[in-house]
């Protein structure tokens, strides 16, 4: 069985880990970093960028850069780029593809399976959208698990003594708090609460708005309509937020932020931690109610907790840590890396599903975060499954008709805690027809809710009189049809193929460029020891290859150009081999050592060679790079 990777698909940053040698390992991305910005961009040439390359160019390409797409999962939101509309699932799939590719490069094998985490307070539509994103990215999502639960799994792997902990998870876009009991090889979620619209992005926005207001007051210029200036302000706000976690004030300097008739304008500000705390006070306060609700639902007081774990980058904010301490009376534990522990927990679950002994025998018991109901007469939301019910679970209830001779019933499935169906999230509607005419209240219709281990809901209705049954077909606009998903899968595969093709083209060009340099270097070192006629042939081939390399754009090479470069490289390799073989033979006959030309008897062009064989290696990789 292949490896099952664990992915923390975050609002602002994502992370991937895997079980290796019985231990969870965080996988560094192609840029050498352990987390990847959840940012996707399309360059002016149409190239797709994901992660750090996408984030770096956001200032100059704000209109085609997409961030925090996770906040739109499970909705009918679409982003339009170059005339094409993308769903949140498709954009998320691009991030997942990047993480998948990084994992494959690390493991040296194909990866097709994953465990992906979601905020505990994600509803059914958001969970299904996450699963669809995985499918589009070419991943079989073996399990969807809640982020706080994953963090507890990472913590509980080495801490199995009995304890009750709180996981306080404040990420880039969402907030979750879970009360979890650990002991006897079981990790059981007792209760969960949260806010899907609260996270680090909101802290950044508060600072950005303050900066906008300050500049407008001082200079009379509204920067909110200037996309490039606004992007610079947002990046500066995020940087300032991070710096204020370790210092009491920071300087924000953005030269040439805009220009007026009077000339260029510069943005300068000193932001103190006290001012930052004032700007974000209401956001920190919003975490209090979910904490109280989770404790209440778990039937515990804060004093009964053994520990409070901090998860998510936003928990580094000192005011957040102070709030946690005031709410719980506990000094929050910093045992876990808040950026990586969720991915680590997901990889442990992946290892468990793959049969990895290092994942241990921990049993994971999670809960559904929101109550599930159907709409009954008067628009009432009649609950079948209460929130914080351990999953997987199944519950059935008998309902009947509301009018005489009613032959069909429309069933509206809702998720949430409000008393009326209209105030909750509708998961979908379906109709059970063919009910024999009868007096009101006579037909018996059994409605069954089935929540799987991923927290995804399946609903069916059965007429017990006729045996006729109907399963739910989600009609909410946020869900992609099977046809849409299949189409997106194909497009994602095409993008992957395009990316590989582009990389192969750049590799071919770089190898050719390296060969031109190394051959010229070796010829210069050998000087007049080379046979004149053979040297002329090599110079002709070298110049031909150099012209092809110089005349190609590494970002936009055609197949014909790549083939030409490869053919010219082979031709140069052949003539150079002949030239340096002759030189080697003449030096051997004369008993001389010849010029210093690397490990073998030829120029220093990769893997050395002996006995007149070519000193070239096909796997030479040029160290030059271009930063985008």
UniProtKB/Swiss-Prot annotation:
Residues modified to Phosphothreonine: 174
Induction: By stress conditions e.g. heat shock.
Amino acid composition bias (Gly residues), ranges on this chain: 591-605
Family of the protein in this entry: Belongs to the heat shock protein 70 family.
SUPFAM superfamilies to which the protein is assigned, alphabetical: Actin-like ATPase domain (SSF53067), Heat shock protein 70kD (HSP70), C-terminal subdomain (SSF100934), Heat shock protein 70kD (HSP70), peptide-binding domain (SSF100920)
Protein function: Acts as a chaperone.
Protein name: Chaperone protein DnaK
Residue span of region Disordered: 589-628
Gene it is expressed from: dnaK
Single GO molecular function: unfolded protein binding
UniProt entry keywords in alphabetical sequence: ATP-binding, Chaperone, Nucleotide-binding, Phosphoprotein, Stress response
InterPro entries: ATPase_NBD, Chaperone_DnaK, Heat_shock_70_CS, HSP70_C_sf, HSP70_peptide-bd_sf, Hsp_70_fam
Domain of life: Bacteria
